[in-house]
Amino acid sequence: METASHSTEAKTNYLNADYGIKSWLLTTDHKRIALLYLGSITVFFFLGGFFAMLIRLELLTPAGDLVLSDTYNKLFTMHGVVMIFLFLIPSIPAVFGNFLVPMMIGAKDLAFPKLNLASWYIFIIGAGFILYAILTGGLDTGWTFYTPYSTTYSNSNVVAAALGVFITGFSSIFTGLNIIVTVHRMRAPGLTWRRLPLFIWAHYATSVIMVLGTPVLAITIVLVALERLFHFGIFDPRLGGDPLLFQHLFWFYSHPAVYIMILPSMGVMSEVIACFSRKRIFGYDFVAMSSVAIAVLGFLVWAHHMFVAGISTYAAMIFSLLTFFVAIPSAVKVFNWTATLYKGSITFETPMLYAFAFIGLFTMGGLTGVFLGAVAIDLHVTDTYFVVAHFHYVMVGGGVTGFLCALHFWWPKMTGKMYPEAFAKLSAVLVFVGFNLTFFPQFVLGYMGMPRRYHAYPPEFQVLNVMSTAGASILAVGFLMPMIYLAWSLQYGKEAGPNPYRAAGLEWMTASPPPDFNFDETPVVTWEAYNYDEIDGTKKGVEVVG
């Protein structure tokens, strides 16, 4: 009977409810739209990774023998723009937020299904402008578009890239609005705020940042394009403008944007750590509120990127102090995850390996961020490879590792197939080892004084650069492996079943892959979040059935 039931479910899941390209391109099913995003950002991830490998190959030798200096400027710019705006910012919210938020709260879809589809098309249009800029000579301003270089001196295609970033911003805003309204209005009966999965809390906080912060970036980028075309004199000091105004506006969005990339990963960690330690999350309320605190404090620390830009000493001291404060809610999360692991029944499936990697790498990134928040240290290492290493420990060690963790954890739910565990574990180890070999030497390089964005360097730095390039090669293999074995699993993987990990949460109470509208009947929630003691029968008074 069970086999027959699963067979029936397989005939009616969201993947085969309709066929043909048109059914995918016009779908309003949040799960299909999530897969459209997944396919898109995967392409951009490997495009950005290709630029990164060219950068590392250029830095193998002190003279920089691979490309010209102007080409090198374009490589690190295009790497940053593609990775940040076309992968990291949309990655978890657009893929797993889209796929999981409705199922986690017992809804049949997001609040605005057509707006959700429009968000993906807007993202693709914006990405098209950025790709056009790349194909017509590239961009050399750095991903930050700093003025007055971007508005006056750069000979690259700044306007097309700026329009691309502007357009993709609307996709981010619409995704955030959709998630906020869905969480407020479409929760299942009994699913109170204090019963919500921490994944939902993290995405809710992220969505608030998207809605409030992204318009500032959009306006700023449009001003850059207009100044470049019409010389309005907003940022150009020769025309009475103020280049520092651009930095204030840009970082007012771009520091909270760090949390757009990290907060969703933190939500993933809470789900995975609770599942594979078979425990309730320690200090649920504190972890939930820390997401809100990060969203609020993230808007108050933007000027710590500007300690050497000419802001007053008084302002630098204030923003330095606020930078120390913003580390507290992140530290609360790390402490509570660690406490959850204590005396847990821990198993080491692939998602848990990525969770451990996240905790270690993100902690390293966070601690070095506190160093950079201290003005005296920042003056010494700003614009060196110390900043590059810190940024990548947060963005890759946090954002990309969290994405891979989520991909492996929910892959059976998304596809109904299991991946080969041995290859997945090998990939996780290669990512961890390759990442540390790539970026830890860069802390040393930065402290020794090697500036970033230079295509040539003194011979004394070569050994550490060779180590970094070797690590990048290992990291590339670790990133390529999941694409291969996950694609293989679609055809040859074992059937997953509804809940292969015996996980808590409403998304595991429907078929794998889920049916069109997620649930045959609206679920009624009568239990607390992360009730693994009840699931495993270890709670006092709960009997194990069967």
Go through the PLM ranges and name each one.
Residues 2-546:
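Membrane-embedded and interfacial regions of multi-pass energy-transducing membrane proteins
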